[in-house]
UniProtKB/Swiss-Prot annotation:
Hydrolase keyword on record: no
Source superkingdom: Bacteria
EC id: 4.1.1.23
Protein name, entry field: Orotidine 5'-phosphate decarboxylase
NCBIfam families cross-referenced by the UniProt entry: PRK00230.1, pyrF
Cross-referenced SMART domains: OMPdecase
CDD domains: OMP_decarboxylase_like (cd04725)
Keywords from the UniProt entry: Decarboxylase, Lyase, Pyrimidine biosynthesis
Task of the protein: Catalyzes the decarboxylation of orotidine 5'-monophosphate (OMP) to uridine 5'-monophosphate (UMP).
A GO molecular-function annotation: orotidine-5'-phosphate decarboxylase activity
GO CC annotation terms, alphabetical: cytosol
Keyword Iron applies: no
Lineage: Bacteria, Bacillati, Bacillota, Bacilli, Lactobacillales
Length: 230
């Protein structure tokens, strides 16, 4: 089921920056935001509690990757923060993914990171020594996530249709690397516009700098939200 709101990546390191950004939006505008490593490691669990207290949904993107027992225990701790979504690295293997699901329980959405959208096929082959195609690697990780009873994967929009063809009905595809037409793609290698992501079947999109660094973040958010809605 498609999330109607684009998820905003809060690419900040301080509580003050985060609060100043969120305060730009009307109180009745309930957002879906992504807290990544930078903000969480700088501010800790309190930043999650603070944002949740405002009524926003929180996607905690820490990409856990460790032995199964450690990941299970860490997810059990994160569950207490009432997060709405969390991530693990699919490369940790099916047993680790199952442990993550056990720790987080069935309430929050749990998705696996396949290949980062900053990774090209040449980089994957050279750095990771994976000699299949990038798409084949993503599909392999996606099938492992489905086997472990995860809700979906993080993937490039270019991979959504192929993933949905090899995973159960309802398997979720969250797409970062979304850029409005004409914007700077930054360090992303595999990008799409909100409209393209919608048409190809993405269930969630994540947008950071085109909103957080816009001259008018609220207007930028509303424009992207409208394009995503179709």
């Amino acid at each position: 089921m498609k999330e109607e709101r684009p998820i905003i990546a809060l690419d900040f390191s301080s509580f003050e920056e985060t609060k100043a950004f969120l305060d730009l939006f009307p109180a009745e505008e309930k957002l879906y935001v992504k807290i990544g490593m930078e903000l969480y490691y700088a501010q800790g669990p309190d930043i999650v509690r603070s944002i949740k207290s405002l009524g926003h949904n929180v996607f905690l993107d820490l990409k856990l990757h460790d032995i199964p027992n450690t990941v299970r225990a860490a997810m059990a701790v994160l569950k207490e923060l009432d997060i709405d979504m969390a991530t693990v690295h699919a490369a940790g293997g099916v047993e680790m993914l199952k442990a993550a699901r056990e720790g987080l329980g069935q309430g929050p959405t749990l998705i696996a990171v396949t290949q980062l959208t900053s990774t090209s096929e040449d980089q994957m082959r050279g750095d990771q020594n994976i000699q299949t195609s990038l798409l084949e690697s993503v599909l392999h990780y996606s099938k492992g996530a489905a086997k472990a009873q995860l809700d979906g994967v993080v993937c490039s929009a270019q991979e959504v249709e192929a993933i949905k063809a090899v995973t159960p009905t309802g398997f979720t595809c969250l797409t970062p690397g979304i850029r409005p037409k004409g914007s700077n793609i930054g360090d992303q290698k595999r990008v799409m516009t909100p409209n393209q992501a919608r048409r190809i079947g993405s269930d969630y999109i994540v947008v950071g700098r085109p909103i957080t660094q816009a001259k008018d973040p609220v207007a930028a958010y509303q424009a992207i939200k409208a394009e995503w809605a179709g």
